Design a protein with these regions (language model features):
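Thiol-/selenol-based redox modules, centered on thioredoxin-like
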Residues: 123-126, 131-177
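N-terminal "domain-start" segment that seeds a small globular fold
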Residues: 9-38, 58, 123
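Bacterial N-terminal signal peptides
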Residues: 1-5
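Amphipathic alpha-helical repeat scaffolds
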Residues: 49-53
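Proline/glycine-enriched tight loop/beta-turn segments at coil->beta junctions
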Residues: 41-45
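Structural microenvironment flanking redox-active thiols in thiol-disulfide oxidoreductases
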Residues: 56-122
Length: 177
């Protein structure tokens, strides 16, 4: 029979959470090209799941204005089309790219269509929604246009509700500080 010891030190009550970084992810954009999140080191990043047929689709216009206003301040927006909520993103990657450009002039990086919840959730969204991975907080994607704010080191700092506009004063303050 084996012998084992259990430590009852009060300092062991807090489980250490290992933070990972978004910089570890290699993705594919809407054009089928490789996009390394490590290329965003030193920049603040807003990650947002998008949809073309949603009541919140107007946020594309705000996102594009923000991207153009703050990209010189080391701020980037990365969009992730997803069809998880009432099938509001039914198009192909090519159709999504055309829609975004034609209707909103989107120039910020847009990744290929992914799943942001469920058994086929993309690994990046597993990271964003799991405290054990992101070191910040457990969450779930509530709807299209939920925003995740990532600091210059690739760590999750804030989660913004889908209904909160991207240019909310709290977000602008976060970009500027």
């Amino acid at each position: 029979m084996g012998l084992f010891t259990i430590s009852c030190n009060s300092q062991d009550n807090n489980v250490a959470v290992q933070k990972e970084s978004v910089h570890q992810f290699v993705l594919t954009d809407l054009n089928g090209d490789t996009f390394n999140m490590s290329s965003l080191k030193g920049k603040k990043v807003m990650i947002v799941n998008t949809a073309s047929k949603c009541g919140l689709t107007y946020q594309y216009e705000i996102l594009e204005k923000m991207y153009n206003s703050y990209k010189s301040d080391n701020f980037v927006i990365v969009g992730f089309p997803a069809n998880n909520f009432l099938w509001q993103e039914p198009g192909s990657n090519e159709e999504i790219a055309k829609f975004c450009l034609k209707n909103y002039g989107v120039t910020f990086p847009m990744m290929e269509k992914i799943s942001v919840k469920g058994s086929d959730m993309h690994p990046l969204y597993k990271f964003l929604t799991n405290k054990q991975k992101n070191g910040y907080k457990d969450s779930s994607v509530k709807w299209n246009f939920q925003k995740y704010l990532i600091n210059e080191n690739g760590y999750l700092e804030k989660i913004i509700s889908p209904r909160t506009k991207p240019d909310d004063p709290s977000v602008i303050e976060w970009i500027k500080t």
